């Protein structure tokens, strides 16, 4: 058993379409814990930090414009093998390749409006979490606190 933390963000289309509760519910039903949660409007410099690996690619400007177009919900999720479990749950970036039952398979409209972002490695998770959360903002669920 390897307890990990990962970063997840419900993108503007997911927020706009009122999918926040449904998405969070899927993670909780899978036994994952939400230990950090906030709704924010991302500014351009923050978006560029988050997606720095895509800088210079043809879709970069469209991605930055989209991710700054409305509020997003940022989460830190903790659980056994959280990075890979969450990646499986969200499905392929292209909704045509995402199986039904995955978040993108069920809700994504296109490659651009694909509802959700999740870190694809522990290293990226640490970097992405640090953009949006301070360590002291993360909360251990009460069920895990020993009294």
From Swiss-Prot:
Subcellular location: Cytoplasm
Protein residues bound to ATP: 11, 59, 87, 93, 104, 114
InterPro entries attached to this UniProt entry: NDK-like_dom, NDK-like_dom_sf, Nucleoside_diP_kinase, Nucleoside_diP_kinase_AS
Catalytic reactions on record: a 2'-deoxyribonucleoside 5'-diphosphate + ATP = a 2'-deoxyribonucleoside 5'-triphosphate + ADP; a ribonucleoside 5'-diphosphate + ATP = a ribonucleoside 5'-triphosphate + ADP
The protein's name in its UniProt record: Nucleoside diphosphate kinase
GO terms, biological process: CTP biosynthetic process; GTP biosynthetic process; UTP biosynthetic process
Similarity comment: family membership: Belongs to the NDK family.
Top-level division of the source organism's lineage: Archaea
Keywords: ATP-binding, Cytoplasm, Kinase, Magnesium, Metal-binding, Nucleotide metabolism, Nucleotide-binding, Phosphoprotein, Transferase
Cofactor: Mg(2+)
Protein role: Major role in the synthesis of nucleoside triphosphates other than ATP. The ATP gamma phosphate is transferred to the NDP beta phosphate via a ping-pong mechanism, using a phosphorylated active-site intermediate.
Signal sequence segment: none
Enzyme Commission designation: 2.7.4.6
Alphabetical list of Gene3D superfamilies matching this protein: Nucleoside diphosphate kinase-like domain (3.30.70.141)
Catalytic center residues: 117 (pros-phosphohistidine intermediate)
GO cellular component: cytoplasm
UniProt-listed PANTHER family: NUCLEOSIDE DIPHOSPHATE KINASE
Pfam families to which the protein is assigned, alphabetical: NDK
Gene giving rise to this polypeptide: ndk
HAMAP family reported in the protein's UniProt record: NDP_kinase (MF_00451)
PROSITE patterns tied to this protein: NDPK (PS00469), NDPK_LIKE (PS51374)
One MF term in the entry's GO annotations: nucleoside diphosphate kinase activity
